[in-house]
């Protein structure tokens, strides 16, 4: 893996490869609670 700074590594940093940082996923335990939290988060982020 060429990081562009002259250092080669066999593994990626904890953030992963920047080209793939476009999608995020979340897993919840309960259906209704997860829907409520998703709605709350979408309203509060605006």
UniProtKB/Swiss-Prot annotation:
It is an enzyme of class 2 (transferase). Its EC number is 2.6.1.1. It catalyses: L-aspartate + 2-oxoglutarate = oxaloacetate + L-glutamate. Its cofactor is pyridoxal 5'-phosphate. The keyword Cell division does not apply. GO terms for molecular function: L-aspartate:2-oxoglutarate aminotransferase activity. Transmembrane segments: none annotated. Keywords: Aminotransferase, Pyridoxal phosphate, Transferase. In eukaryotes there are cytoplasmic, mitochondrial and chloroplastic isozymes. Belongs to the class-I pyridoxal-phosphate-dependent aminotransferase family. Homodimer. Important for the metabolism of amino acids and Krebs-cycle related organic acids. In plants, it is involved in nitrogen metabolism and in aspects of carbon and energy metabolism. This is Aspartate aminotransferase 1. It comes from Pseudotsuga menziesii.
